[in-house]
Amino acid sequence: MSLKHFIQDALSSWMKQKGPESDIVLSSRIRLARNFEHIRFPTRYSNEEASSIIQQFEDQFSEQEIPGIGKFVLIRMNDAQPLEKRVLVEKHLISPNLTESPFGGCLLSENEEVSVMLNEEDHIRIQCLFPGFQLLEAMKAANQVDDWIEEKVDYAFNEQRGYLTSCPTNVGTGLRASVMMHLPALVLTRQINRIIPAINQLGLVVRGIYGEGSEAVGNIFQISNQITLGKSEQDIVEDLNSVAAQLIEQERSAREAIYQTSKIELEDRVYRSYGVLSNCRMIESKETAKCLSDVRLGIDLGIIKGLSSNILNELMILTQPGFLQQYSGGALRPNERDIRRAALIRERLHLEMNGKRQEDESI
């Protein structure tokens, strides 16, 4: 299993599954920050120390298997081309920060559900991604990977403070739990403007699709905990679970209200966006995200039939600049990317609809 295995498909195998509440919650993520006890933090360690971390993971964890999760393979960042690294970021397998780490690495499970980032902000960052609303399941998997690593690594841990991390905001549990949610109706009704400040007051933070500093394009929001100290892992996950459940309910109510009061306007918006995606000859990534959001809403409300939301998950990744260029075989100028993106969307939508039509005719 090589790097090519992880960059050739837009959809990770876990993304092809339908999780609970997947019309609103695209994915659930658990991330655990850990550090070696006897090695200085990445802000201060030497090149030799950084290299020793990668080497230990290559020797002791690469090509090893966890029951129920699968085999892992180690990818060194300095072995990957810039475009390949960008694709891994766009698939949410690694962070943008890791791509800039000269001694960075990533231990990836075959199904891409688990990634262990090495020499990022901390020595070790365990990430588990599950489809739909499955925070508790993701937490269970993260703990399993954490225990597996701890069998061979002594973690930096303090009885009073918990796990020690490079950034003080991660000290304690070292846990970041997050859900990625598609909230178009709350945006359309502008309820999101009062909901975000209320969420922030609960010790949670709302970000865009690629985390800190990113914009919520395509009405996709990432909601995560901010506090890691003074609360148990279970409390952190349960608090986020509770808020996400309320958001699901509010989004469903807003969708129902729009459908009941502005059905024609909503259908017009959905079909216009579908028309753009089906027929455009050039399209930028931001407009693509907006149109994909409208079409996804149309599918979820039964306005558009014969189109799977899975195709939209695929297009979300496939139309990002890195994947688009990787798919096209090399670097593209911005206008070339817009032309290629439009062609790719048309091809995939027409292929999907034709496949559905043939399926219906054969029944």
UniProtKB/Swiss-Prot annotation:
Transferase in keyword set: yes
Induction text: Is repressed by the transcriptional regulator CtsR. Forms part of an operon with ctsR, mcsA and clpC.
Reaction(s) the record says it catalyses: L-arginyl-[protein] + ATP = N(omega)-phospho-L-arginyl-[protein] + ADP + H(+)
Notes on activation and inhibition: Appears to be allosterically activated by the binding of pArg-containing polypeptides to the pArg-binding pocket localized in the C-terminal domain of McsB. The McsB kinase is inhibited in nonstressed cells by direct interaction with ClpC; upon heat exposure, the interaction of McsB with ClpC is dramatically decreased, leading to McsB release and activation during heat stress. Its kinase activity is counteracted by the protein-arginine-phosphatase YwlE in vivo. Requires McsA for full kinase activity.
GO biological process entries: phosphocreatine biosynthetic process
Keyword Nucleotide-binding: yes
UniProt modified residues of type Phosphoarginine: 29, 40, 86, 190, 255, 269, 272, 346
Changes seen on gene knockout: Cells lacking this gene show a defect in the delocalization of competence proteins that is not related to altered expression of the com genes on the levels of either transcription or translation. Inactivation of mcsB also decreases transformability. CtsR is no more degraded.
Highest rank taxon of the organism: Bacteria
InterPro entries assigned: Arg_Kinase, ATP-guanido_PTrfase, ATP-guanido_PTrfase_AS, ATP-guanido_PTrfase_cat, Gln_synth/guanido_kin_cat_dom
Database matches in CDD domains: bacterial_phosphagen_kinase (cd07930)
GO cellular component: cytoplasm; extracellular space
Subunit structure as annotated in this protein's UniProt entry: Interacts with CtsR in its autophosphorylated form. Interacts with McsA in nonstressed as well as in heat-stressed cells, whereas strongly interacts with ClpC only in nonstressed cells.
Cited HAMAP family: Prot_Arg_kinase
Function: Catalyzes the specific phosphorylation of arginine residues in a large number of proteins. Is part of the bacterial stress response system, where it is involved in regulating the global heat shock repressor CtsR; phosphorylates arginine residues in the winged helix-turn-helix domain of CtsR, thereby preventing its binding to DNA and consequently inducing the expression of repressed genes. The transcriptional repressor HrcA, the chaperone GroEL, the unfoldase ClpC, together with several ribosomal subunits, represent other physiological targets of McsB under stress conditions.
Entry's family note: Belongs to the ATP:guanido phosphotransferase family.
Protein name in the entry: Protein-arginine kinase
Source species: Bacillus subtilis (strain 168)
